[in-house]
């Protein structure tokens, strides 16, 4: 492949495959809070957090690392106690303060707006001084305060995203022929980090290949969603998408060939496809991205592991997957996400063994058409978020 494509793919991977502690959206909130740099939190008179629908959903009922608590309030408190240099690992090494939570609870207001990823924070202290931060469009894009960018920026521009979307499945396959050392290291880190989240069985089915996929993937998801102080390697800014895209393949390898080189290439392909699916739709939406995007990554990665660069088989697997799960709603980050990942495992594995014609529903002729069609449905589901948020907001937390 030409150098420009290889450079683009490498940059995208370095930007989109990152370590995250806890659900990405509580990390987003904590990071935004920490950017306000409040030296004495008990001086706060009022704190206002504005989130887009998707960020609100994902933070509302999910565990926050190092707090033993769930939801937006402990994420805010954790952010006040954390170091902004940790970014999405903001809750790493914090010592939670219950008295501070009781204090902040009376002064916190959460607002929700429609649109792309958004986390804005406004704080007023008792002296009348104001503090502000804003992260938008992606989880690390800090708009306020202005911070010094790294000399070599990893941030992906809109133009580069469009360039990535124009790539073909064959480009991703060709990239596997000569993988940069830094990307090999990134994939290996992903294997060890995500496997480390597997703690027992969330769903104990048995020891056949599919059951093992489900057991391992749901166990890791449950570990994340309950707020264990253990990082995951996120893909396209989602830890659960990272788990869905990688753990079924890791499990398959463990029970079949134990071929580390083939495993790394299969996982890398799964990551590339998951990112590709995300760029075609959005980071957050009314459709469950773990299933629709991470699941598409998993099925293509599994098919590559099993059949190599067989485009006929790869396109067939994409069609079968598209005929199955797309359309499942996202009602926020929570323990129940593990059950959706279980469905994703079943859909990904079964897609290897069935042929579905493109004449079925939204199924496309090939991988690219399938991703584009799922993306269209995802965007059309946008209005659902308002109703999902209304239902969630009525609950006592």
From Swiss-Prot:
Cofactor: how and how many bound: Binds 1 [4Fe-4S] cluster per subunit.
Organism superkingdom: Archaea
Catalysed reactions, as listed in the record: L-cysteine + H2O = hydrogen sulfide + pyruvate + NH4(+) + H(+)
GO MF, any single term: 4 iron, 4 sulfur cluster binding
Active site per the UniProt annotation: 23
Biological process terms in GO annotation: L-cysteine catabolic process to pyruvate
Cofactor or coenzyme needed: [4Fe-4S] cluster
Pfam family, one: SDH_alpha
Presence of the UniProt keyword Hydrolase in the record: no
Record key words, sorted: 4Fe-4S, Iron, Iron-sulfur, Lyase, Metal-binding
Protein residues bound to [4Fe-4S] cluster: 288, 330, 337
EC number: 4.4.1.28
Entry keyword annotation includes Aminoacyl-tRNA synthetase: no
Assembly behavior: Homotrimer.
Similarity field: Belongs to the L-cysteine desulfidase family.
Known function: Catalyzes the cleavage of L-cysteine to form 2-aminoprop-2-enoate and sulfide. The former then spontaneously hydrolyzes to pyruvate and NH(3). May be responsible for the production of sulfide required for the biosynthesis of iron-sulfur centers in this archaea.
Name used for this protein in its record: L-cysteine desulfidase
Lineage start: Archaea, Methanobacteriati, Methanobacteriota, Methanomada group, Methanococci
């Amino acid at each position: 492949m030409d150098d420009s494509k290889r450079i683009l793919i490498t940059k995208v991977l370095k930007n989109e495959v990152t370590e995250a502690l806890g659900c990405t959206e509580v990390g987003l909130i904590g990071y935004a809070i920490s950017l306000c740099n409040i030296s004495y939190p008990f001086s706060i008179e009022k704190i206002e957090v504005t989130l887009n629908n998707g960020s609100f959903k994902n933070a509302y009922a999910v565990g926050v690392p190092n707090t033993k608590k769930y939801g937006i309030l402990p994420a805010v408190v954790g952010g006040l106690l954390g170091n902004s240099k940790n970014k999405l690992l903001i809750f790493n090494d914090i010592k939670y303060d219950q008295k501070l939570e009781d204090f902040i609870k009376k002064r916190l207001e959460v607002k929700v707006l429609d649109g792309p990823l958004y986390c804005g924070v406004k704080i007023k202290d008792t002296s009348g001084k104001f503090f502000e931060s804003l992260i938008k469009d992606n989880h690390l894009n800090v708009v306020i305060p202005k911070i010094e960018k790294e000399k070599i920026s990893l941030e992906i521009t809109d133009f580069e995203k469009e360039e990535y979307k124009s790539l073909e499945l064959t480009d991703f396959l060709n990239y596997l022929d000569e993988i940069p050392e830094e990307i090999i290291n990134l994939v290996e880190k992903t294997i060890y980090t995500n496997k480390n989240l597997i703690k027992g069985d969330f769903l104990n089915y048995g020891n056949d290949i599919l059951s093992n996929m489900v057991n391992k993937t749901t166990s890791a998801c449950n570990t994340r969603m309950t707020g264990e102080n253990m990082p995951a390697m996120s893909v396209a800014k989602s830890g659960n998408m990272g788990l869905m895209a990688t753990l079924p393949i890791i499990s398959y390898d463990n029970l079949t060939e134990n071929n580390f080189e083939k495993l790394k290439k299969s996982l890398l392909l799964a990551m590339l496809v998951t990112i590709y699916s995300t760029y075609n739709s959005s980071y957050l939406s009314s459709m469950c991205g773990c299933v629709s995007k991470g699941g598409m990554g998993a099925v293509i990665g599994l098919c590559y592991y099993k059949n190599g660069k067989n485009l006929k088989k790869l396109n067939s697997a994409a069609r079968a997957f598209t005929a199955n799960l797309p359309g499942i709603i996202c009602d926020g980050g929570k323990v129940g996400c593990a059950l959706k990942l279980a469905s994703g495992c079943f859909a990904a594995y079964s897609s290897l063994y069935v042929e579905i014609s493109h004449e079925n529903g939204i199924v496309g002729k090939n991988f690219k058409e399938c991703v584009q069609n799922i993306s269209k449905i995802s965007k059309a589901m946008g209005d659902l978020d308002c109703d999902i948020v209304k239902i969630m907001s009525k609950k006592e937390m």
